[in-house]
């Protein structure tokens, strides 16, 4: 059988080993050191909005710290986009808080501003005002930033911007990862750049970054001995892994262009085909890195048939994220919406999108698509 075509596999740029070797040569193996500092500066320079970045062990850790920094505690309610990966919602439970899930809108597949406001009004009247909003740029597609911000500001609720999938995307020329009161990034192995495993917290002030780093290094107080006046976490990024990130940052823009080219391959392929929709930017204000290219088919049955046809040729594809309000672990929590995310999940499929896919890989994908849609 031919080699596997992955949905989104790591793509090294060439200089990752140089930074890793420097870490070994200088014995900076711990979760601190020149690569960590350099990686944070590289991201800050790239985002270019006067932000401060704390490199962490995962995007999940970054969301957890964001909730702590915003004062989320037991029994607080936190609004969360339902159509996302579970890592967006799990940290709410870590804090013994209560998630309130909100549906997507049909253009970007991200949080619906109308459903968001409905949720805020309902919870404020029946319980208490939610303490934070976690909103996601799904598959690299920016959410409706202005509309979501308008609702959040109207009710004075801070936004945690989950930009785990959207490094390299932008809205009205501003980089994703800079729109939240606190924002997060992910560098998991399947992301547009990787540190093997890793993430980052992005803030607007140096003081908040320093607080995040303090919490991420077991909240050790300034003392000659180990002194702790609050609970901390082991969430800092390894200097070795940060070296991978420094090499990856050098090729980020190239990776974005390659993924956008792969997305255009699918747009062109399906452009004259009825019943198949490719996720695309709704206007020139939106610029997606197209981390994953996703389509919506006519039915669940057709979606599954295509997935299995690709699988039979050793080509990975994957259904869209199953909404959190449909997950067994979250079914007891409130949901506000009209079924958009459920419909997308039932009919949607992510197709191979990696920046390292070859012409031969594209041809193999095309052959399967041709046979399926003939």
Regions found by a protein language model. Name each.
Residues 32-77, 91-94, 101, 125, ...:
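Phosphate-binding glycine-rich loop
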Residues 84-89:
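Conserved coil-to-alpha-helix start sites within the AMP-binding
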Residues 34-41, 49-54, 114, 118, ...:
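PLP-dependent aminotransferase class I/II
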Residues 81, 98-108, 318:
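Short beta-strand->loop structural element characteristic of the AMP-binding/adenylate-forming
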Residues 1-30, 352:
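N-terminal "arm"/small-domain region of PLP-dependent enzymes with the aminotransferase-like
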Residues 58, 104, 189, 217, ...:
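Short, conserved catalytic or interaction motifs in soluble domains
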Residues 107-195, 200-202, 207:
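Active-site phosphate-binding strand-loop segment of PLP-dependent enzymes
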Residues 78-79, 92, 99, 159, ...:
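A short hydrophobic/small-residue beta-strand
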